[in-house]
């Protein structure tokens, strides 16, 4: 039976790179949006994707003037799915907004607008790295990608402020120390990154390893 991973999304036009990355490593994507009934029944893992800013009220703040209009229904869906996945110890991979939700779920807060603009650099080719991250040794992310400096393509205007409980920081921006990777050591595979490996998976074998490791974590959980 094929491995199946739920992918959360809001804009169908933007979900293709995430789905393609999973197919590349032999996993069938199952798309889930807040517009339809959602659950993790019949799937073996969860990927939380990028998208618009989280509702600041979900971490006890008022919305910043430069924050995007939130989608509370998506926030509720992803928080519910993440809770279910962690309770069942299903493999979880968070990407960009997925890292931020991972932190908020665990009681953390966010920087609502990074004034420096260093993390919002965009290029015509989304796979092109824009800065480096430093991956911490003795973390699952280091076991997958290797410790030390790695070029990545992160692009975001929000980031982790207060770290949530049970979380370990696995990567930081080499420029300013912004959190770029989180994980839970007490779970089989609960990893989140701030950059967009789905855009690099075909051009950078190192980033493909992240999806391969995610897929390899699934067999113990394959749903009948």
Which role fits each region the language model picked out?
Residues 1-93, 103-105, 111, 115-144, ...:
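N-terminal beta1-alpha1 cap of cysteine-dependent amidohydrolase-like domains
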Residues 99:
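The feature captures the ABC ATPase H-loop/switch
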Residues 96:
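Conserved G/P- and acidic residue-centered "switch" motifs that form tight phosphate/ATP-binding loops
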Residues 190-195:
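Active-site-proximal beta-strand elements of phosphoester/diester hydrolases
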């Amino acid at each position: 039976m094929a491995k199946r991973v739920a992918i959360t999304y809001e804009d169908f036009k933007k979900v293709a790179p995430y789905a393609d990355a999973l197919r590349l490593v032999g996993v069938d994507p199952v798309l889930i949006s807040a517009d339809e009934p959602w659950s993790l029944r019949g799937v073996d893992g969860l990927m939380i994707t990028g998208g618009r800013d989280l509702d600041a009220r979900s971490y006890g703040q008022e919305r910043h003037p430069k924050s995007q209009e939130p989608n509370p229904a998506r926030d509720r869906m992803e928080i519910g799915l993440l809770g279910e996945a962690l309770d069942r110890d299903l493999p979880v991979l968070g990407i960009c907004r997925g890292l931020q939700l991972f932190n908020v779920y665990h009681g953390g807060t966010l920087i609502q607008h990074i004034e420096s603009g260093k993390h919002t650099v965009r290029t015509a080719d989304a796979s092109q790295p824009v800065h480096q991250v430093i991956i911490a040794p003795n973390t699952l992310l280091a076991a997958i990608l290797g410790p030390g400096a790695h070029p990545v393509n992160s692009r975001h205007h929000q980031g982790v402020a207060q770290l949530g409980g049970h979380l370990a920081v696995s990567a930081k921006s080499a420029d300013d120390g912004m959190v770029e990777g989180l994980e839970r050591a007490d779970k089989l595979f609960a990893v989140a990154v701030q950059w967009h490996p789905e855009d690099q998976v075909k051009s950078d074998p190192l980033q493909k390893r992240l999806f391969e490791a995610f897929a390899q974590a699934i067999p113990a959980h394959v749903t009948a």
